[in-house]
A protein has these predicted regions:
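Nucleotide-activated chemistry modules centered on ATP-dependent adenylation/adenylyltransferase
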Residues: 2-230
Length: 230
């Protein structure tokens, strides 16, 4: 995985799960004119939606014509069913990519966290980033980190941490509405049709959350604004 990057001109990383928020993060990177590399965590041992998530992540990468690297050998344990630290898992794989490709200047890591979960992601990222900085300087703790390694370290970007899911959908609808057709948001018993097309259950909390957010966005996007601009 580390040495399988074909495009050596990439300058940022996007963790692409196949869901809405990560797809929006990829949209943001492309809209900014950056050259993203996408990373997908493939965990069939603990995630029953691993196949549709990977399939939709690939669809999203193809949609934006970017490279997708799949990590199926994460350095973190995969057996536990109570893995509440997916961000740490992603950061571990990201660190492997950065450390294993010193010729690539990764400037940004773009996260799709929204207003509901950005705080949790920031907390989980704090210490892995400290460890990464210390490791690049071959130090046991951060006081000895070289200034150049702080300057060279990629910045974590949270472009949607002040937006709710329906607001992200509204934004995407105005620019790339077809992107919403290749988003996977289901944690229930999905169906498979025609060998590839994955059909969400429509009943689980993830399905209900996504459908409600789309409904809210649709009702709000074109409503008449009251008052007038001065």
């Amino acid at each position: 995985m580390v040495n399988s990057i074909e495009n050596r001109k990439v300058n940022c990383l996007v963790l692409l799960s196949g869901g809405l928020d990560c797809a929006a993060a990829l949209w943001y990177a492309k809209r900014k004119g950056w050259n993203p590399l996408c990373l997908h965590l493939y965990n069939p041992n603990i995630i029953k939606q691993a196949e549709p998530e990977l399939a939709h992540a690939q669809l999203q990468a193809d949609f934006f014509n970017v490279e997708l690297v799949v990590d199926d050998k994460s350095s973190l344990p995969q057996e536990t069913k109570e893995n509440m630290y997916s961000v740490l898992q992603g950061m571990s794989a990201i660190a492997m990519i950065i450390q294993g490709n010193k010729d690539i200047n990764f400037q940004y890591i773009i996260w799709g966290a929204n207003a509901d979960d950005s705080f949790r992601q920031r907390l989980q990222l704090r210490y892995p980033l400290r460890a990464l900085a210390a490791g690049q300087s071959h130090q046991l703790e951060v006081h000895g980190v070289k200034p150049r390694h702080i300057v060279q370290a990629p910045l974590n970007v949270f472009p949607f941490e002040y937006l709710y899911k329906s607001e992200i959908i509204s934004m995407i609808t105005q620019d790339k509405p077809e992107l919403l057709d290749i988003v996977w948001s289901c944690s229930g018993e999905y169906k498979v049709e025609k060998g590839f097309e994955y059909i969400p259950c429509g009943k689980c909390t993830k399905c209900l959350e996504f459908n409600y957010a789309k409904h809210t966005a649709k009702k709000s996007l074109f409503k008449k604004q009251e008052g007038r601009w001065v």
